[in-house]
Amino acid sequence: MANEFLFTSESVSEGHPDKVADQISDGVLDAILAEDPKARVACETLVSTGLVVISGEITTSAHPNYREIAQDVVRRIGYDNSDIGFDYKSCAVLAAINRQSSDIAQGVNEGEGLDLDQGAGDQGLMFGYATNETPSLMPLPIYYAHRIMQRQAEVRKDGRLPWLRPDAKSQLTVKYVDGKPVAIDTVVVSTQHNPEVSHAQISEAVIEEIIKPVLPKELMQGEVRYLINPTGRFVIGGPHGDCGLTGRKIIVDTYGGAAHHGGGAFSGKDPSKVDRSAAYAGRYVAKNVVAAGLADKCEVQVAYAIGVAKPVSLMVNTFGTGKIADDKIVDLIRAHFDLRPKAIIQTLDLLRPIYSRTAAYGHFGRDEPEFTWEQTDKASALRAAAGL
């Protein structure tokens, strides 16, 4: 008897208040890395009505203009008029920045602390995941939830749907049979809009101009339920409608709930923070395992102690889809991937101003050149070593 279930993932637009905060934090990080690649950055942002607050611990020789960075991000997203509740020209920007703790720094700096290699910036556990249910080796629900949000921004910015505003959310429910996605069951889109447009206009335009062009037709052969702005009205939105904070969309940023999450957010953190760099490395490892054909699905957990370079643990789960035993895959990972922080940074070339692009529409499953952790350059070596 077939095993059937529904699985749901959500995404949010670049204009969602939490994503505005993420993009400002990563905008600060990129501005600093462009001048000082060895900087230590932990940048948190809060956005509310007419206000941006930037805080955190930053040690750098660079001199970022926090106000200019924040305003540029807000402008690029599309908050350019006080009529929509947030305007880059008039929002206040407050910055309260401290230096990184010297106690932490000595454990991370190479040649200092008890471990003379570059240690992990904190303790913690991180997960990477890949599945062969999409060409990008991402779970299908989160992959297409992101594509819906990217399409919303595209038709908003190019003028096809000029009544759209920046804040939006999507949610995709997919039917699975025996672990494979077979049909889209429900699509939810809530999008901010001008007050003049009717709900009927919004529904028709969102379905025809945003949803249908991006979802795979072969998964929409049955009856799909569309829920468009189900409250009936979404005029007040963005930072005016909800306070936004860095790091509050960690499931949107990763696998949409299809895999575990260690709890650490990404945006605003330089790659000495394993919350970010080791999660990217975990995706790199898992994607190469699946690309090599060693498993249909692969989840990798890696854990660190602060100030210690080598991971304290490494675990693999292929959910019964492995072509070889999971412990053998662990052995292959240890042989082919160096998961010490310095090695991750070097392998994935992470000391570059590449992070603003990651701060909306997911950190994984993207084919832009900045996303080095999406490479499958180890797949052939893994397959050969596995004897497949």
UniProtKB/Swiss-Prot annotation:
One Pfam match: S-AdoMet_synt_N
UniProt KW keywords: ATP-binding, Cytoplasm, Magnesium, Metal-binding, Nucleotide-binding, One-carbon metabolism, Potassium, Transferase
Cofactor section: Mg(2+); K(+)
Binding site for L-methionine: 57, 100, 242, 273
Compartments, as annotated in UniProt: Cytoplasm
Entry keyword Magnesium: yes
InterPro entries according to UniProt: ADOMET_SYNTHASE_CS, S-AdoMet_synt_C, S-AdoMet_synt_central, S-AdoMet_synt_N, S-AdoMet_synthetase, S-AdoMet_synthetase_sfam
Cofactor mode of binding and number, as noted: Binds 2 divalent ions per subunit. Binds 1 potassium ion per subunit.
PROSITE patterns found in the cross-reference section: ADOMET_SYNTHASE_1, ADOMET_SYNTHASE_2
EC numbers, comma separated: 2.5.1.6
Ranges for region Flexible loop: 100-110
Entry superkingdom: Bacteria
Coiled-coil region(s): none
HAMAP family associated with the record: S_AdoMet_synth1
Similarity section: Belongs to the AdoMet synthase family.
Record's subunit section: Homotetramer; dimer of dimers.
PANTHER family: S-ADENOSYLMETHIONINE SYNTHETASE (PTHR11964)
Functional note: Catalyzes the formation of S-adenosylmethionine (AdoMet) from methionine and ATP. The overall synthetic reaction is composed of two sequential steps, AdoMet formation and the subsequent tripolyphosphate hydrolysis which occurs prior to release of AdoMet from the enzyme.
Name of this chain's protein: S-adenosylmethionine synthase
Organism: Azoarcus sp. (strain BH72)
